[in-house]
Amino acid sequence: MGSDAWVGLWRPHRPRGPIAAHYGGPGPKYKLPPNTGYALHDPSRPRAPAFTFGARFPTQQTTCGPGPGHLVPARMTVRGTDGAPAYSIYGRPRRSAPFLTPGPGRYFPERAGNATYPSAPRHTIAPRNWGVQAEQQSPGPAAYTVPSLLGPRVIGKVSAPTCSIYGRRAAGSFFEDLSKTPGPCAYQVVSPGVYKSRAPQFTILARTSLPQDNTRKPGPAAYNVDQHRKPRGWSFGIRHSDYLAPLVTDADN
């Protein structure tokens, strides 16, 4: 294309910075607070006062007395219930069923076992204090914790002062072994650069190499000289094209 196609001094060039029209943003995805209305208003914008109409309160209804639900007994007077006698009619009591005495066929003497025959006495040795522990609910002497009466920490009792003997101190006493004190070698020598002017220090860095291409290059074995480009070939196409409409005549109808 020649230079005649361009008009003026403008030529296509790469933009200096990103252009917003070239990128697809999320659009109205962010839910920002509105600037209209009173509720959920943007706090960074001024908001005008809003007025509402309140609801009408119902009128208070006064009652003069109890309604039909207040039932007053008929025998109730100003001074209480009247003293007229009242009688009630109870139902007829039900007759009790007669006692059915068992006949001779209800007894089985053969099942009595040793109860009907003489047998030697048998005794059972029960454990000690049988039935006493189950009925006793009071705590024993071991349930109470009595404070000790020995020592200075007795509650409600006067006690004499007590003294305690502590162990000997290894440092500062008269029997301290002074040969175990630290010598001059135990202290670390402070560097003179801390309290004096420090000389400049230099470091030797490693040798830097020029930037170069470190990608892997194919060697001689990567090329196969026996492979050649295949020559051009021909193929037989279909008789009718799929993109051509069939011929329809009046005789076909």
Curated annotation (Swiss-Prot):
Keyword terms of this UniProt record: Cell projection, Cilium, Flagellum
InterPro entries registered for this protein in UniProt: CIMAP, SHIPPO-rpt
Domain of life assignment: Eukaryota
Compartments (UniProt record): Cell projection, Cilium, Flagellum
Any one GO CC term of the record: motile cilium
Name of one Pfam family that matches: SHIPPO-rpt
Keyword Lipid biosynthesis in record: no
UniProt keyword Aminoacyl-tRNA synthetase, yes or no: no
Placement of STPGR repeats on the sequence: 182-207
Family statement: Belongs to the CIMAP family.
Full protein name: Ciliary microtubule associated protein 1B
Taxonomic source organism: Homo sapiens
Recorded name of the encoding gene: CIMAP1B
